């Protein structure tokens, strides 16, 4: 069965990893920030919107993973009448094209969550300087965007 459908299996696995790992990383990252924010909000509930913005930032990688999932399924023909037959090499190409977003999205979401969690301390101590924490988070976001771009470009040239 793998020899007959191995290409399709690998392509689906790559797409699933792109969205799955990115969402796992985003869940971990946003969860860490939410935990840290509850302490601040118990003392100063007026900082809710600032804390919420920091919490949402690590969630973007999950969205990027979903974009790659759609791109991969589009390359496979899922939105144009049915999945195409593909060779093992073609499936491996799609699988490999999804890896930058899968691995990069997963790890960058966790590390961005750590930066955003630390940035919650800025809100607790100097609420007017909270935008500095956002800027620090954007540095990590840049690498998630590079992973997204790499996977998109690879998928555009996959077959």
Residue spans of the language-model regions?
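Hydrophobic, small-residue-rich transmembrane alpha-helices and their short perimembrane loops
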Residues: 1-159
